[in-house]
């Protein structure tokens, strides 16, 4: 009986992990940059503590020595990306998500297991995207949230950002604001799975930060929010009924 229970637990965990995912690749104006400017997470597990520094970019880089640090749950990324991706103000980047690290096929959902929820993208102006720790303010440039499919449909039939990712082989286009000031930015891609968000701490955040350099543009420098701090575990939309 004990071994049966253990096997059942392992099976349940495996099924749960299948639904997890990470943003991994970036396209710039239709050109595949692969993962060259992505701070790749070390696993496809989500962040669930909105008060943790992991809510920034899955982890943060210490300002003194740029060493990889993790939160108490062990959430981490591999640190600074290999390079920065250059994109013109007004250009289009395409974020790309898949369930397993290194995966790029379209044979499985980008994020499975009925992990329905919004997809949002933030940017943060920084001095150097390769060393920024994510403590600077972030402003939102994109969101793909919820839409009712029909008056007779059930909740699982509704439109969600994560469903759009699944429909498009994990890809989603995001326009960089045309008047944005030139310079280095962290581009923070986030999908929030709400299937377990009936109580505080149940929402699952799948986050990757990309290191980009914006060229051209103007002088726009939007006000933003801080992570952690922007979300509270009991906020409507983070906790759902």
Model-assigned labels for residue ranges:
Residues 91, 183-184:
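Surface-exposed loop/turn positions
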Residues 176, 181-183:
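A glycine-anchored, Pro-Gly-centered beta-turn/N-cap motif
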Residues 2-119, 125-171, 194-241:
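Peripheral, solvent-exposed domain-edge segments
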Residues 175-176, 193:
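Short acidic/polar micro-motifs centered on Gly/Asp/Asn
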Residues 185-189:
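A short tyrosine-centered beta-strand micro-motif
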């Amino acid at each position: 009986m004990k071994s049966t229970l253990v096997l059942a637990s392992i099976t349940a965990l495996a099924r749960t992990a299948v639904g997890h995912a990470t943003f991994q690749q970036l396209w710039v104006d239709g050109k595949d940059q692969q993962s060259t400017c992505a701070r790749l997470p070390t696993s496809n597990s989500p962040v669930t503590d909105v008060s943790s520094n992991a809510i920034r970019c899955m982890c943060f880089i210490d300002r003194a020595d740029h060493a990889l640090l993790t939160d108490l749950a062990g959430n981490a990324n591999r640190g600074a990306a290999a390079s920065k991706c250059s994109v013109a103000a007004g250009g289009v980047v395409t974020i790309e998500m898949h369930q397993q690290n290194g995966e790029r096929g379209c044979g499985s959902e980008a994020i499975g297991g009925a992990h329905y929820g919004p997809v949002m993208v933030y940017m943060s102006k920084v001095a150097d995207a390769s060393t920024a720790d994510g403590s600077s303010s972030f402003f939102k440039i994109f969101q793909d949230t919820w839409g009712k499919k029909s008056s007779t449909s059930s909740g699982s039939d509704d439109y969600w950002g994560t469903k759009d990712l699944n429909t498009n082989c994990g890809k989603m286009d995001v326009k960089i604001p045309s008047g944005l000031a030139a310079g280095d930015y962290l581009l923070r891609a986030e999908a929030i799975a709400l299937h377990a968000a009936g109580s505080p701490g149940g929402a699952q955040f799948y986050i990757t930060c990309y290191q980009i350099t914006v060229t051209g543009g103007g002088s726009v420098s939007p006000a933003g929010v801080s992570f952690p701090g922007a979300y509270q575990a009991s906020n409507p939309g983070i906790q759902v009924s």
